[in-house]
Amino acid sequence: GLAAVLPWGLCFALFKRIARWQWLYGVQCREALAQALQRDCCDDADAWLAERRLVTLLDHADHYLLRTRSVAWIERHVQVHGQWEPGGRAALLWTFHWGTGMWALRHARAHGLKAPMVLAAPSGPDFVGRAVFGLYVRARMRSVDLALGEPVIFVPGGMAEVRGALACGQQVVVVMDVPQDQVAVTRVTPLLNVPVSVPAVLPQLAVDQSLPVTVFYMGVDIRTGFR
């Protein structure tokens, strides 16, 4: 919550220092580093881990920044490449589980898109005995509601709402890198020369209905904190 109370420049400088703490997000970072080394995506393990921790800190901070900063403030800190699909027409907006994407949702809404987001329901084994974690996840989902101005569509069980939104000429935001065990139908496709499983239902829906698809992501300049 430091991002909610500190000037952003000071907060980001503090985050860069905190990201050097080797114990921070220890298990998650070690698992991620093992994957990066396996895929030959890492030359300097210490630098890679510091960046991984920084991106995680920023991902958490964006929840609080979205709640406490104006659209104008956010847009002053974002450099945009490309454009959104025009509003008023059904379309799919695809993105990925890569930190710092919250501001992109606010940007989409500010540019006229009506786009509910498809998210996994906050339930299941990951939430058992983790009350604080559950409250935080639900608060983040509320931030997604606020960013887009549309209620989240929860899955499983949300396909009727997805079809309804598309029938009303809305866009639907979909995160495509979902674990194989969390979706019923998948397809194998190459990514960075590695076969990966991706959800198949919504891509097939896009083909069947000739829906425009816009792929978007929001990166971060780790020197400045700009997106």
Positions of predicted regions on the chain:
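Catalytic core of membrane glycerolipid acyltransferases/transacylases, capturing the structured
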Residues: 89-154, 184
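Structural alpha-beta junctions
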Residues: 40-44, 112-115, 147-149, 200, ...
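Short amphipathic alpha-helical segments and helix-helix/interface helices
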Residues: 81-84, 105-109, 141-142, 162-163, ...
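Membrane-anchoring hydrophobic helices of lipid-metabolizing enzymes
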Residues: 1-102, 138-143
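Structured helix-beta-strand junction loops
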Residues: 87-89, 147-148, 168-169, 209
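Conserved active-site-proximal loop/helix segments of enzymes involved in bacterial cell-wall
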Residues: 221-227
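Short acidic-hydrophobic, aromatic-tinged amphipathic segments that line or gate anion-handling sites
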Residues: 76-82, 149-156
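Membrane-associated lipid acylation/remodeling enzymes share a hydrophobic transmembrane-juxtamembrane segment
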Residues: 157-160, 164-221
